[in-house]
From Swiss-Prot:
Residues 1-145 form the MGS-like domain. Its EC number is 2.1.2.3, 3.5.4.10. Keywords: Hydrolase, Multifunctional enzyme, Purine biosynthesis, Transferase. NCBIfam families: PRK00881.1 (NF002049), purH (TIGR00355). PROSITE patterns: MGS (PS51855). This is Bifunctional purine biosynthesis protein PurH. One of its GO terms (cellular component) is cytosol.
Length: 521
């Protein structure tokens, strides 16, 4: 049965209710600084750590709990006679529970213009020491670093005569070690990102030592292939709009490939302001469209490549209503994603329990970095988050684009960013007409896109084409023009740009350059 708890928290969420409940169970509460003041002001009996140890807080609060009477009471093993004897000899009572969360270092350094002095003053020393001491001796000490665990601990204490199960203690200890590792990792990342000048005015996005922290969501039946094992991890606090914030409403457990494809679909669809639908297969869009409604967007997207859409991932950037749900339900789909689902849509898919429905709040989440593992190393880059605007486009052909061509070109360019390189995308009237992806030759991607359109019964006459990188020769342009394209958008930047521009003028084709490349591997 616990007799004494030490509570010292930066995040005061729920601490009054928690401390009051402990006090009601007869637990003596030790505390420091602001936490002690808050408890006392609210009528909760509390002993200041300085009074408990007989040693005052000092150095502007830098030294509060770094004392043998605190750490001895935490670290002593109750089943070791030598430890118990040492406590008795030095008059050190045991501390049976430690409730600590840390100075907000990560929030501090995330602020614009954060100074090194601000960062230093938000590095917690005593807190991590107490947490680690408690977690090390978790057999005898209940340790809590997260306010969301208060209710479970109180429930067990009430139900088990002031005791908490070993399983809960061990789970809380694991959480503490993960928390302190993340905390120290954030400090390391910050310090190793600073320049060596005395003002530390420069701060790199790529620290000399990189620490990453992710929490496991689930283990999966297998990875990309059945002989591979896999698990899904997420950041501690994903941004609003990130895939990791999904809520699964129904369906089978998500697979490794489901999550990879769902991310590709969601990242693409949320870039559109209009009601949009994206159909993904093997991380490539096989149909993208905008429309006046989710139903119209889906119907147009499906036309691009209905064969490849079979068993795909479908994402919407609007609530999926009953009309769209009825249409989608006719198609075999693995995962369906939307910001929300109407009650009618939920009813329709309730009869198709294998279909995974994911709700994700819309938002502008962008990963701080993209990662790619290589043998013995890690490639790190900023995400490809650039969206070209009209003012940045350069018309390089003699022929000027019409408003409709500009609209089609911008749509095609937006889609091409999400197609594996080499990427060629034919579009018209807010829908993809043919997608050529992942070929070693840009000409082959153009030919495949043309074949796809032909197979779907779509005419490419008058279409707009986007290429994710420049045309190194005129031959790629000749292929898309021969297929029916009358306007083309690409980054430019080739030593043969003029040759390609001349070819466009020769064939009366509109050509725009973006100055931005969108390789995707």
């Amino acid at each position: 049965m616990i007799k004494q708890a030490l509570i010292s928290v930066s995040d005061k969420t729920g601490v009054l209710e928690f401390a009051r409940a402990l006090s009601g169970m007869g637990v003596n509460i030790l505390s420091t600084g602001g936490t002690a003041k808050l408890l006392a002001e609210n009528g909760i009996s509390v002993t200041e750590v300085a009074d408990y140890t007989g040693f005052p807080e000092m150095l502007d609060g830098r030294v509060k709990t770094l004392h043998p009477k605190v750490h001895g009471g935490i670290l002593a093993r109750r089943d070791f006679a030598e430890h118990v004897s040492a406590l008795e000899k030095h008059n050190i009572p045991t501390i049976d529970m430690v409730v600590v969360n840390l100075y907000p270092f990560q929030q501090t350094v995330a602020r614009e213009h954060c100074s090194l002095e601000d960062a230093i003053e938000n590095i917690d020393i005593g807190g991590p020491a107490m947490l680690r001491s408690s977690a090390k001796n978790h057999k005898d000490v209940i340790v809590i670093c997260d306010p969301t665990d208060y209710s479970q601990v109180l429930g067990e204490l009430s139900a088990n005569q002031g005791e908490v199960s070993y399983e809960t203690k061990f789970t809380l200890a694991k959480k503490v070690f993960a928390h302190t590792a993340q905390y120290d990792g954030a400090i390391t990342n910050y310090f190793t990102s600073l320049g060596a000048d005395k003002q530390h005015a420069t701060r790199s996005s790529y620290p000399a030592t990189l620490n990453l922290h992710f929490e496991k969501v689930q283990e999966m039946r297998y990875g990309e292939n059945p002989h591979q094992s896999a698990a899904f991890y997420r950041e501690s606090n994903p941004q609003v709009g990130a895939l990791a914030n999904y809520t699964q409403l129904q369906g089978k457990e998500l697979s490794y490939n489901n999550i990879a494809d769902a991310d590709a679909a969601w990242e693409c669809v949320k870039t559109f302001d209009e009601s949009a639908c994206v159909i993904i297969k093997h991380a490539n869009p096989c149909g993208v469209a905008v429309g006046a409604s989710p139903l119209e967007a889906y119907s147009k997207a499906l036309q691009t490549d209905p064969t490849s859409a079979f068993g795909g991932i479908i994402a919407f950037n609007r609530e999926l209503d009953g009309n769209a749900a009825e249409a989608v339900a006719k198609q075999f789909v693995e995962v369906l994603i939307a910001p929300s689902f109407s009650e009618k849509a939920k009813q329709i898919f309730a009869g198709k329990q294998n279909v995974r429905l994911l709700e994700i709040p819309l938002g502008n989440a962008v990963n701080a970095h993209d990662f790619k593992r290589v043998g013995g190393g890690l490639l790190v880059q900023s995400p490809d988050a650039k969206n070209v605007v009209l003012a940045e486009l350069k018309v390089v052909s003699k022929k000027q684009p019409t408003p409709q061509q500009l609209q089609d070109l911008m749509f095609a360019w937006r889609v091409a960013k999400f197609v594996k390189s080499n990427a060629i995308v034919f579009c018209a009237n807010g829908m993809t007409m043919g997608v050529g992806a992942g070929q070693m030759s840009r000409i082959d991607s153009a030919r495949i896109a043309s074949i796809k359109a032909q197979n779907a019964g779509l005419s490419l006459v008058g279409t707009a084409v986007a290429s994710d990188a420049f045309f190194p020769f005129r031959d790629g342009l000749d292929v898309v023009v021969a297929a029916g394209a009358t306007s083309v958008i690409h980054p430019g930047g080739s030593m043969r740009d003029q040759e390609v521009i001349d070819a466009a003028d020769e064939q009366g084709v509109v050509m725009l350059m973006t100055g931005t490349r969108h390789f995707r591997h």
